[in-house]
Regions:
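N-terminal secretory signal peptides that target proteins for export/translocation
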Residues: 1-4, 8-14, 22-75
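Sec-dependent N-terminal signal peptides
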Residues: 74-85
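C-terminal motif of bacterial Sec signal peptides marking the signal peptidase cleavage site
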Residues: 89-92
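Patatin-like phospholipase
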Residues: 94-177, 192-455
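Gly/Ala-rich beta-loop-alpha elbow adjacent to hydrolase catalytic centers
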Residues: 179-184
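Residue-level signal for mature regions of secreted extracellular proteins and peptides
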Residues: 7, 86-87
Length: 455
């Protein structure tokens, strides 16, 4: 290229145009035949004056050099074509060696050194964790109070408003079990630790810092692992989930309280329930990283944020699992499906009251909007319908369970149509609006419903 620029600088315009025409023709397949003038190939060009004799030899040398460059490029291209299949094959091998080889290996996987820190939503009763003391909550004097916080992205601010108003009313219970999915996974540790962290949640969901999470990769994202960069989400979680938070979660776990987070194993297509208190109380040096990785995975919308790779082992072989948004499997983490499906295996209440509080960070009612007949709007609209129906089914299952067992059912959801755009997913005005909605409805006494209401 340097040679090209130097030579062109030494040529008069007429000769440069002739050479460029020759190069353009060769590059794009329009090569003049011997004796054919450039204007015969490119008839729209003006007649060019003949080049002067003084620069003829330089132009000839330049043409020879350019032809050599073209031959080099052609040879390099052919070499790449020959090598590409081998490169792709090697790349494929590198990507699959450290992953589960089949469903059997994936289902038998565990996190080395941690014991029973996870189970599956679809686990059979005989597959339930054997260490019951580390999983079952210890009932308090007033029975068991369980808080379940759903997914919903920016709608998580609704939960924050509810919790803030609940604390202000001084009626917020000390929850024995807290579960979180997706954005609910980010809220759950603070809801678990109590009202002292309301201001932290307020800052996280209404200050505008959530808008930093939207950093695109540009066109590259369409062919990579995600549209948005993972860095901002990971950095935010590392900033708010500190060693001090881990120690406090561990202390509450030792008191018999339980914190559960849901992720989705994309390879096995199974919803994974993580015992976050057991992880925090493990004493392992990598416990904080695993804790943060699980929260990141649960909040990572597939395709929007990259999945999180978590190290596991099965039968002595070590590999990585790909975990992503828990909301892909369920918008709300409730009881194992085996309990919900069979009344003959319901755990005894032993005379203790059980309260299920479910906060849905989304609207359950239909929301009318004219959908543009374009690819992305149609996909997004269909996805929102899927989320609604999935949540409605989960709530119906839990409600039926409470009717069989005598437990009490309480559900809160966004029941007003707040303007929202999926092209501006963490809009601060939207987050503040749903925060205020949750707060105001709690104060007004209209928040909780004793059965699912979908219209």
């Amino acid at each position: 290229m340097i040679l090209f620029r130097q030579a062109m600088g030494q040529m008069i315009p007429c000769q440069a145009e002739t050479v460029l025409g020759d190069v353009h023709g060769n590059l794009f397949g329009r090569v003049p035949s011997p004796g054919t003038r450039p204007r015969d190939v490119y008839p729209r060009r003006r007649r060019r004056p003949a080049a002067c004799a003084s620069c003829h030899s330089k132009g000839t040398r330049l043409i020879s050099d350019l032809r050599s460059i073209r031959l080099f490029k052609r040879g390099l291209t052919r070499a790449l074509i020959v090598l590409l299949p081998f490169v792709l094959t090697l790349s494929g091998c590198m990507q699959t060696v450290d992953r589960a080889l089949d469903a059997k290996e994936a289902d038998g996987a565990s996190i080395a050194g941690y014991g029973e820190i996870r189970t599956y939503v679809d686990a059979r009763l005989d597959e339930a964790p054997r260490d019951v003391r580390n999983w079952a909550p210890t009932a308090g004097r007033n029975g068991i109070n369980a808080l379940m916080i759903s997914g919903g992205g920016a709608g998580g601010a609704f939960s924050v408003g509810v919790l803030s108003a609940w604390s202000a009313a001084k009626t917020r219970p000390r929850f024995d079990v807290v579960t979180g999915v997706s954005t609910g996974a980010l809220i759950a540790p603070y809801a678990f630790l109590g009202s002292a962290y309301d201001d932290t949640l307020l800052d996280l969901y209404t200050s505008g810092i959530a808008q930093e999470l939207v950093r695109t990769k540009g066109v590259v994202g369409l062919f990579g692992s995600s549209l948005l960069r993972a860095g901002p989400l990971r950095q935010m979680i590392a900033r708010f989930v500190t060693p001090a938070i881990l120690r406090q979660v561990a202390a509450e776990h030792r008191k018999g309280r339980r914190l559960f987070i849901l992720t989705t194993n994309l390879d096995s297509q199974r919803a994974v329930v993580w015992n976050m208190g057991a992880i925090a109380d493990s004493g392992r040096p990598d416990a904080l990283k695993l804790f943060q990785d699980i929260l990141t995975a649960s909040a990572s919308i597939p395709g929007v944020y990259p999945a999180v790779m978590i190290k596991a082992e099965s039968g002595g072989r070590h590999f990585e699992e790909m975990h992503s948004d828990g909301g892909s499997a369920s918008q709300v983490l409730m009881l194992p499906q085996a309990f919900l499906a069979s009344s003959s295996h319901l755990p005894p209440s032993k005379g203790k009251s059980v309260n299920f509080y479910v906060i849905v960070n989304n609207a359950l009612m239909p929301e009318f909007a004219t959908t543009p007949d374009k690819t992305l709007p149609v996909i997004m609209r269909a996805y929102s319908i899927f989320v609604k129906s999935q949540t409605q089914s989960a709530l119906t299952a839990l409600y039926n369970y409470t009717r069989l067992t005598g437990a009490r059912f309480h559900v809160a959801a966004i029941d007003a149509q707040v303007p929202y755009s999926m092209f501006d997913p963490f809009n601060t005005n939207y987050m503040r609006a749903v925060y205020n909605l949750g707060y105001a409805e709690f104060v007004a006494g209209t928040l909780w419903k004793d059965k699912p209401v979908f219209r």
